[in-house]
Amino acid sequence: MRFYQELQLNQSGSKELIRQSKTTKEKLYHIAVYLFKIAITVAFCFLFVTLFSILFGSENSIAGVVVLLCIMVFRQAHFEIHAGQSTVLLALFFINMTVCSHLAHKLPPVAGLLVNIVALAILVFLGCHNPSMFNQSTLVLGYLLLYGYDVSGKSYLMRIAGMAVGAVLTCIVFYRNHKHRTYDKHVKHILQEFDLSSTRTKWQLCQIICVPVVICIAELCDMPRAMWAGIAAMSVILPLMDDMQYRVRKRIIGNIAGVICFTVLYFLLPSPIYAFIGVIGGIGVGFSTQYSWQAVFNTFGALAIATQLYGLKGAVSLRIIQNVFGVVFALLFCIIFHWFVSKIKVKEVL
């Protein structure tokens, strides 16, 4: 395997290559390549978001994160349909994330709930057809980040401009990398495959309904950072209930561990470099292949921002409460939803 090809591997691929090394020299080489890949990835991400913030305003740095996430994911991920139609869908998703997230945030919680359901239905039904691709971790996460860090006035106009540029860049990268792939399916085939008896459709509906409901309840309870609960719910909703229960446990444990680690760093490090704790978290995620460790390090970035607004005690309390509420509610919702759908199918048979 050539150097460039090895750089294209994900964390699991790189770690597997290291494990399969036959000599110490070979193992050290693969470790060096892996560390170099992490370093250039972190540097690229930092420079990209910094440049985006300079061009479109610091309040839109989160939009830069969303654009960066889409570019990095969709250079490899796809929608399993015709490349041309997929590219059009990708542009539609950017419009959806930019417009609907802003509209939903401006409305009262219940009205915003309806907008969020419609917006997520477009993203999930058309963009998350294959659960194993985990496209929801990009599209739904991106939507929720823009929703949670909404802006208005001139800043929103700059966000529109930034997301438009991001859409063009992502579509170019996506089409360039996928234009030679052949898929027999088109958009109409995806819509025709809607079936309440299928595991995939039930999973999609849980994502579409549960995540907005979680956010709505959090907002009605006047919880700041309601989108944290939505992100937590999104991340644990999986097609198979056993997998979902596993993720719920790991999310709660990982979040508490992340809060403890962040608190320790907060007291050990000097205040001028608190913001870099989020960078440490990003590096940690880069090294992580297991969901539990990703949950730990993802906590760093969220708390690095929240502590500036709510203080350490407030941010930590919010993080734990929102995440536990989000994942537990999602688990209960999915159990009830699956039971309800099974009852409907039984009545149809009778």
Question: Where in the sequence are the language-model features?
Answer:
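N-terminal signal-anchor module of multipass membrane proteins
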Residues: 1-90
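Membrane-interface helix-loop-helix junctions at boundaries between adjacent transmembrane segments
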Residues: 101-192, 196
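Membrane-helix interface and helix-disruption motif detector
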Residues: 51-59, 84, 97-111, 153-162, ...
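Hydrophobic alpha-helical transmembrane segments
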Residues: 39, 86-91, 113-117, 156-164, ...
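Transmembrane helical segments that form the transport core of multi-pass membrane transport proteins
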Residues: 212-265, 269
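Intrinsically disordered, low-complexity non-transmembrane regions of multi-pass membrane transporters
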Residues: 1-35, 178-201, 342-350
